[in-house]
UniProtKB/Swiss-Prot annotation:
<dbReference type="GO" id="GO:0071424">
    <property type="term" value="F:rRNA (cytosine-N4-)-methyltransferase activity"/>
</dbReference>
<feature type="binding site">
    <location>
        <position position="81"/>
    </location>
    <ligand>
        <name>S-adenosyl-L-methionine</name>
    </ligand>
</feature>
<dbReference type="Pfam" id="PF01795">
    <property type="entry name" value="Methyltransf_5"/>
</dbReference>
<feature type="binding site">
    <location>
        <position position="109"/>
    </location>
    <ligand>
        <name>S-adenosyl-L-methionine</name>
    </ligand>
</feature>
<keyword id="KW-0489">Methyltransferase</keyword>
<feature type="binding site">
    <location>
        <position position="102"/>
    </location>
    <ligand>
        <name>S-adenosyl-L-methionine</name>
    </ligand>
</feature>
<dbReference type="InterPro" id="IPR023397">
    <property type="entry name" value="SAM-dep_MeTrfase_MraW_recog"/>
</dbReference>
<keyword id="KW-0963">Cytoplasm</keyword>
<keyword id="KW-0698">rRNA processing</keyword>
<dbReference type="GO" id="GO:0070475">
    <property type="term" value="P:rRNA base methylation"/>
</dbReference>
<keyword id="KW-0949">S-adenosyl-L-methionine</keyword>
<keyword id="KW-0808">Transferase</keyword>
<protein>
    <recommendedName>
        <fullName>Ribosomal RNA small subunit methyltransferase H</fullName>
        <ecNumber>2.1.1.199</ecNumber>
    </recommendedName>
</protein>
<comment type="similarity">
    <text>Belongs to the methyltransferase superfamily. RsmH family.</text>
</comment>
<dbReference type="InterPro" id="IPR002903">
    <property type="entry name" value="RsmH"/>
</dbReference>
<feature type="binding site">
    <location>
        <begin position="34"/>
        <end position="36"/>
    </location>
    <ligand>
        <name>S-adenosyl-L-methionine</name>
    </ligand>
</feature>
<feature type="binding site">
    <location>
        <position position="54"/>
    </location>
    <ligand>
        <name>S-adenosyl-L-methionine</name>
    </ligand>
</feature>
């Protein structure tokens, strides 16, 4: 029997946040080992459909085995969620009832030594989510100048010793392995100070830079919103403050009505809210989950619901019936089923 080492974080909260219904159509933007995808398929039965995306071909292969019992209900795509809208258009998979992002590293990726995400074991300085990417962590630490490296470690790692670490890296490079780099970082900051390893923030910064995680997230949130039907849910689980800040600010901006400056007495922007915040406060794992899965302790979940204004001519759905509807420019409603062409594992462009 195949074992799936990654324990999905806030699984029950994710299903509730998405509002999964039988016959619904969903997107899992971060497939990983397939735990969230499996639960979405189970709760959307009968008639549910799921498109799951991952940049890591090994994740696709593992999840394909796990989800094969769902047959044509699931489509696995080896691509980056930065291309979310193009993927959905390619497979005529729109509009959708819900979209999930479970950001950051899966336990499977973290434990895979050859990927170089962890400093606990010796491995090549890689950190690429997809082997097709050109830039690696080794490229950054071995070629960036002092200012560029220091700024990167501060911006993406929020590391207070960024300049000291960058200077030590320049003095000791070139680097080939994770343990070499971690050792230099630890010495640069004077050893351990508390529970967190001194290299943690720098490794986070390198991983974010290599995979362009923050810019991809910003782009994908807007794409996801455009794919949701009226009442559709957008659920995002983040693991550090940089990710959560992007999600929080995006949700708040899109949930606002008027966005005119305060010194303008009358609204002239005509901006309408396109999202409704389901939870005003961030959702965090229970103490029980954290004790069961310590890697969930930093997780934060935010949930928003799509609002489509009358006259937009955009798809929406009835959550109660799970029907795909269409609001015309005149406000009339047409009921129908959207197409779903793909049912097999595919490679992305």
């Amino acid at each position: 029997m195949t074992e799936y080492p990654h324990i999905p974080v806030m699984l029950e909260e994710s299903i509730q946040g998405l509002g999964v219904i039988p016959g619904g159509r969903y997107v899992d933007c971060t497939l990983g080992a397939g735990g969230h995808s499996e639960a979405i398929l189970e709760h959307s039965y009968p008639g549910g459909q799921l498109l799951s995306i991952d940049a890591d071909p090994k994740a696709i292969a593992l999840a394909a085995e796990r989800l094969k019992c769902f047959g044509s209900s699931v489509l696995l795509v080896n691509d980056n969620f930065a291309n979310l809208k193009d993927i959905c258009q390619r497979y005529e998979y729109m509009p959708v009832h819900g979209i999930l992002f479970d950001l950051g590293l899966s336990s499977m990726q973290l434990d895979r030594e050859e990927s170089g995400f962890s400093f606990q074991t010796e491995a090549p300085l890689d950190m690429r989510f997809s082997p097709g990417q050109e830039l690696s962590a080794a490229d950054i630490v071995n070629t960036y100048d002092l200012a560029g490296l220091s700024d990167l470690i501060w911006k993406y790692g929020e590391e207070p010793f960024s300049r000291r670490i960058a200077r030590a890296i320049l003095e000791k490079r070139p680097f080939k392995t994770t343990t070499e780099l971690a050792s230099v970082i630890e010495k640069a900051v004077g050893g351990r100070h508390g529970r967190i390893h001194p290299a943690t923030r720098t490794f986070q910064a390198l991983r974010i830079a290599v995979n362009e995680e923050l810019s991809h997230l910003e782009s994908a949130l807007a794409q996801a919103q455009s794919l949701l039907g009226h009442g559709g849910r957008l659920v995002v689980i983040s693991y550090h403050s940089l990710e959560d800040r992007i999600v929080k600010q995006y949700f708040q901006k899109e949930a606002k009505g008027c966005i005119c400056p305060d010194d303008i007495p009358q609204c002239v922007c005509n901006h309408k809210p396109s999202l409704r915040l389901i939870n005003r406060r961030v959702i965090t794992p229970s103490d029980e989950e954290i004790s069961r899965n310590p890697r969930s302790r930093s997780a934060k979940m935010r949930v928003a619901e799509r609002i489509i204004q009358p006259g937009e001519g955009r798809f929406f759905h009835s959550r109660a019936k799970g029907l795909v509807n269409h609001v015309s420019e005149t406000g009339s409603v047409r009921y129908g089923q959207a197409k779903h062409k793909g049912v097999v594992q595919r490679g992305g462009s």
